[in-house]
């Protein structure tokens, strides 16, 4: 009986360990991403809306992402509140500024991250069958 119990425990540990290890690694990756995004402020360094470069419309905006899933878009004394989330496995980041006008409402998409570094992120999203491109740089 003891031998069978031991074999069952061994069997369970061998087959559940990789799953829990993978979840642990994923959790660590998510924590690293959140720490990276929430430390410091960001600016839009490129926004291409279909074929039109509208980067200049974001001049002066600073974005502060917080670990609780909120983000502020700040220009001068005006702050616009929004939310954000990231999916490490899908390599996406989503933002939503529900009460925003242009240009901030143009950020209200799920963006596929195409390139990322500790101080910059490049992403794209499909809108009306055409890609919009976004680049953020850390201030």
Question: What are these model-derived regions, one by one?
Answer:
Residues 1-21:
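Sec-dependent bacterial lipoprotein signal peptides
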Residues 22-85, 89-139:
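Lipid interaction determinants
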């Amino acid at each position: 009986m003891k031998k069978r119990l031991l074999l069952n425990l061994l069997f369970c540990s061998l087959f559940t360990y990789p799953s829990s290890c993978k979840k642990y690694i994923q959790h660590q990756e998510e924590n690293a991403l959140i720490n990276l995004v929430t430390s410091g402020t960001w600016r839009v360094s490129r926004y291409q809306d279909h074929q039109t470069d509208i980067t200049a419309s974001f001049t002066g905006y600073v974005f502060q992402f917080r670990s609780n899933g909120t983000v502020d878009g700040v220009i001068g004394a005006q702050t616009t509140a929004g939310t954000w989330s990231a999916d490490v496995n899908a390599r996406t980041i989503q933002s939503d500024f529900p009460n925003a006008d242009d240009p901030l409402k143009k950020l209200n998409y799920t963006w596929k991250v195409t390139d990322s570094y500790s101080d910059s992120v490049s992403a794209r999203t499909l809108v009306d069958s055409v890609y919009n491109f976004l680049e953020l740089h850390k201030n």
